[in-house]
């Protein structure tokens, strides 16, 4: 009985404990309950982050890269997948988008259980998905939102429609605490050409003035170097 109460206080279903312990061994049940409680307490000490993005089958970008980065920095990572992609280091060969309803289900499931301390948004390829994300983040009063306005894969494959870009500008970017465009994305958002470092500064300044948030302009697509630029007031 004590083990059952301990497990319930920790938020675990009792059946999970019985599955891993001998039904007649109360001491073993207690140890299992204590183990669950200890793991839960350790989890609660960590910061939590939710990544909303596409799945990269090669593991080099998207949900997979976000989760690796979060875990490497001691953050408990959660995810809501916007699309499945078939891709590798040479290009994208297929994209299967989830429905807005299923994305909404994922967001509800995560946020109502383990509230994220931060949210990172990556590839969202359609207007409907962008609107779904915007609606749910407002509903749950999400904070510390990082928007990576993914438009083109590193390999050059286009990942978002023109209409979706406009919706991204009006629905998600105004909610951001930080926007992290690469050079081509910064050119689209700032509506200017970037060739030199001073152009990066000017583009970041324009984006900052439009959306009133920090801008991390990533220089990986630059012809000269891969320096990143952080612009904030």
Please place each PLM-identified region on the residue numbering.
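Surface-exposed amphipathic alpha-helices with a cationic face
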Residues: 4-9, 67, 71, 137-138, ...
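Asp-based, Mg2+/Mn2+-dependent phosphohydrolase catalytic module
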Residues: 1-44
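Glycine/serine-rich anion-binding loops at beta->alpha junctions
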Residues: 52-71
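Conserved phosphate/ATP/ADP-binding segment of small-molecule kinases
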Residues: 162-232
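A short helix->loop->beta-strand "cap" motif at the edges of active sites that frequently abuts
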Residues: 12, 140-145, 211-213
């Amino acid at each position: 009985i004590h083990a059952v109460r301990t497990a319930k206080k920790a938020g675990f279903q009792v059946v999970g404990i019985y599955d891993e312990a001998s039904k007649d061994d109360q001491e073993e049940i207690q140890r299992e309950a204590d183990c669950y409680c200890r793991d839960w307490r350790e989890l609660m000490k960590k910061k939590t982050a939710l990544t909303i993005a596409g799945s990269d089958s090669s593991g080099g970008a998207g949900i997979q890269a976000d989760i690796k980065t979060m875990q490497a920095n001691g953050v408990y990572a959660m995810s809501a997948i916007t699309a499945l992609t078939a891709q590798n280091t040479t290009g994208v060969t297929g994209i299967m988008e989830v429905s807005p309803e299923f994305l909404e289900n994922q967001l509800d499931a995560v946020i109502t259980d383990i509230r994220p301390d931060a949210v990172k948004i990556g590839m969202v390829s359609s207007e409907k998905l962008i609107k779904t994300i915007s609606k749910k983040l407002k509903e749950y009063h999400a904070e510390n939102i990082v928007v990576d306005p993914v438009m083109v894969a590193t390999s050059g494959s286009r990942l978002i429609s023109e209409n979706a870009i406009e919706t991204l500008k009006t629905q998600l970017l105004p909610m951001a605490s930080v926007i992290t465009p690469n050079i081509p994305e910064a050119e689209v958002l700032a509506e200017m050409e970037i060739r030199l470092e001073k152009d990066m500064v000017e583009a970041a300044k324009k984006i900052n003035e439009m959306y009133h948030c920090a801008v991390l302009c990533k220089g990986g697509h630059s012809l000269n170097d891969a320096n990143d630029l952080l612009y904030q007031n």
